Structure formats: C-alpha cells, structure tokens
Amino acid sequence: MESDYNDIVAEYYDFEADSFERRAGENHVLKTLRNDFREFTLSRRPKKMLEIGYGPGLDMTWFADRNDIEIVHGVDISPEFQRIVENKARQRGDGKILPNLGSAEDIVEIVGESAVDTVYVYFGGLNTVNDLESVASAISKVLKPGGSAILTFVNRWYLFEIFWNILLLRPRRAFSRLRPVWNGYSPTRSLPSYCPTAREIGHKFGQFLNPVYRKGYCILHPAWYRKHWAPFNSVRSRSLYLMDRILQRTPLWNFGEYSLYIFESTDKE
C-alpha cells in the first residue's frame, strides 16, 4: 500500500519535473515565500543539511552556494527530479549536493542517524507522506542534538479559499482540504494529499522535537495560484503582506495557505 502511494506521487512529479523550475521562477508569491523560508533556515546557522522533497534542486543549490554550508543532502521520491539534480551536482563538481531517491520515511537509512544539523521541507512536501508521525520520528533521528527542522505545510483551514468558493457556489471545492484525501491544486491531475491541522502537527512532531516557532502565510494575500490578483510589488500586494504580518499575532495566524514550523532536536541519550 505504501509503495503504491509513493509510486502515484512519484509519477505525478515526474510529469511536472521539466517545467517545475521555470514555473517557480515566474511566480512572485512563491519567490517571496521561498525567500522567507530560506531566511528562517539560515537563522538556525546550518552547516550540514537535508532537504526532503528537493524538486529541481532550487534550494539545495542555493544553500550549497554559501561558503558556510558544508553539504546538502536531499531525498525526493521522483526519479526525474533526482536526474535533474544529479546533473546540477556533476556540473558543480564540488560534492556539496547529494540528491538521493527515496521517501521521507527512508531518510534514516539514506543519511544515517545524527547526520545533519538542519532538515528543511518547503512548500508542503510532507503533505504527501504515508505516516506523518513516523516521518517526525525519522527527522528527530537524523538530526544532531540541538539541530533544527524547518517544515512548511499546506494548511487544512484556508479560510479565504472556503469563503471564496462558497460565494461562487462551489461547496465541494470549498471544503476539499477538510476531507481525508485532498486531491491537490490541479483541476485536471490528482495528487492525493493530506492537510494536517496545526494541532496535529504540534502533537506528532512534539513527541520527538521541541517546538520553537510558527508562522502563517497568505492569510489575506492571494496564494501563489492567484498571483495576478496582487501583482508583484503593487500597493495591493504590499498592503496585504502587511496585514498578514499583523494577523500573525492573532488566532488567525494558521488560517492562510501555508504555515511554517520550526522544531529543535533535544539532547539524545
């Protein structure tokens, strides 16, 4: 069953692989969020890193370009993404990026215990895992004592999406993330996923790691797939980002498109 699901996810991303990097570079909302994710990651002073769900290697190469980063391991379920990043690794020739093929559940076998000081997952790579609790345990094992995990998730409760689709008389789409299986963003291609709540994430990861920080994104600012509603650097975009920052201090922080969580490894006996 686990293998069948992993095959479905791998096939989905293999199809997307060739155009993934171009589309990511063209989307100003994705770029803004990615820059913020990276800044939070750098604030943890990483040296030996692991990315789960590395895609075309945008972040692996970005971190590897920094002199203070020693090595960036990666684990991704897509053979096409691995091929793309292996080509980038060969072109670099410095041995700093190591793309591996596998699932999030495989990371202990791939990189070993206490192998890295930082694990990061951007743009909801853990929304497509079989068992989030087992992944939380695996992340805690690969981290060195005092290491950090910077994790982002597609939110379960995205209030704007719910209200907008209700107004458009699309109740099925309005509540699609609340179902046991969410089919992803594409209206034509299904990616079976699960959107956990902040409480679920805190409970499952809190068994193995200490929570340090959390932040929500695109609470009022349009999500990446509605980037045209707030053009780059427009007054509307800047104003909505400001309002999102204000809402971070309220219970609405977790009702946007994405949330980021930082967890820290405890000392291991």
Task: Give the ranges of each region predicted by the language model.
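A C-terminal cap/extension of S-adenosyl-L-methionine-dependent methyltransferases
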Residues: 199, 203, 213-269
